[in-house]
């Protein structure tokens, strides 16, 4: 008969459990005195044996599950397996059998070891790839931060507005303009270059001024006209005389200066002062009502219609447009017959002849020679 103890366990099983417990205590004491002892392997074997005893006591010896003990590889076996793994990760059956004979291991254990070793290798490769990606991301963020720091100073340098904008706004005319003026556009540079050209051209006609002094008074045209040509053969056109009184008294003042060559010098000085004041206040060589322009004496640019849109006075601009309508047709017709303004073909006799013709059209019969 089988004797049952507490909780249905047999007395033999109870005695076996007590014996295994005592064996485990002895093994623990031996592990404390012997540092070379490996408790993990021995503890696993004790646990396996304890499990076998419990299963045998519970189900009997017929129903005991077959369990395989964990294989403990030696250093020589691991070295041989690692060398083979470095050569190939997937050894064939012949290579596995030879390796099993060399290491004194079953061929199934060698096959399982290679399977586990491949899994470990793949895991290590994934971890290395993650580390490389992390380093690349860190390097990319550092590079982006460095680029941002390098790009930051030019943005700050562009932030303050240019002082030219404020100066251009203050120098704009106060009255309503017929033409929009952009300070930063090439129109301003063209106007400034035009002003410099007029100042440079003041020195050019000095030799012509001497000839004009000998010939008599200069060719007087309407000083308010936007375009003029002193040497035009159409200057003695009878259509000129009706347009002269429409310049609001400016022609009368200019006729008073036309009596002697000394007045020509005064007009030259007055024109220089007028051009200097105009260039300082406005950025165009524009006309002004304060002083009559003496541009006809200098023989400068023929077409001065571009700065008319920036004149500060509207009634004066209307008189200019009227004069322009009167002067446009004869000037355009006469421009085709002359090669250039400063051509050397003009002589003193031609100048005297044209001066007399113009004086006759103005009503001045007696002129000093």
Swiss-Prot record:
One of its GO terms (biological process) is regulation of neurogenesis. Residues 66-125 bind DNA. The keyword Zinc does not apply. In embryos, expressed in mesencephalon with strongest expression ventrally. In adult, expressed in midbrain. Residues 222-233 have a biased composition (Low complexity). InterPro entries: DMBX_homeobox, HD, Homeobox_CS, Homeodomain-like_sf, OAR_dom. GO terms for molecular function: DNA-binding transcription factor activity, RNA polymerase II-specific; RNA polymerase II transcription regulatory region sequence-specific DNA binding. CDD domains: homeodomain. Keywords: Developmental protein, DNA-binding, Homeobox, Nucleus. The keyword DNA-binding applies. Residues 124-253 are annotated as: Disordered. It is found in: Nucleus. Belongs to the paired homeobox family. This is Diencephalon/mesencephalon homeobox protein 1-B. It comes from Danio rerio (Zebrafish).
